[in-house]
Amino acid sequence: MKRTYQPSKLVRKRRHGFRARLATAGGRKVLAARRARGRKRLSA
């Protein structure tokens, strides 16, 4: 059985990147929550 995590910089950015977060209402809520917590990094 292969491992489930097969790293890819492109897929990481597309799925979890800043622009991907801004694209949906839920993603914007995620960013707002992370800003409220004072996260240094908001997204991948």
From Swiss-Prot:
HAMAP family: Ribosomal_bL34
Family annotation (InterPro entries): Ribosomal_bL34 (IPR000271), Ribosomal_bL34_CS (IPR020939)
UniProt keyword annotations, A-Z: Ribonucleoprotein, Ribosomal protein
Keyword DNA damage: no
Encoding gene (name): rpmH
Gene Ontology CC entries for this record: ribonucleoprotein complex; ribosome
Pfam families noted in UniProt: Ribosomal_L34 (PF00468)
UniProt-listed NCBIfam families: rpmH_bact
Family in the record: Belongs to the bacterial ribosomal protein bL34 family.
Protein's name in the database: Large ribosomal subunit protein bL34
Organism: Rhodopseudomonas palustris (strain HaA2)
Gene Ontology terms, MF aspect: structural constituent of ribosome
GO biological process assignments: translation
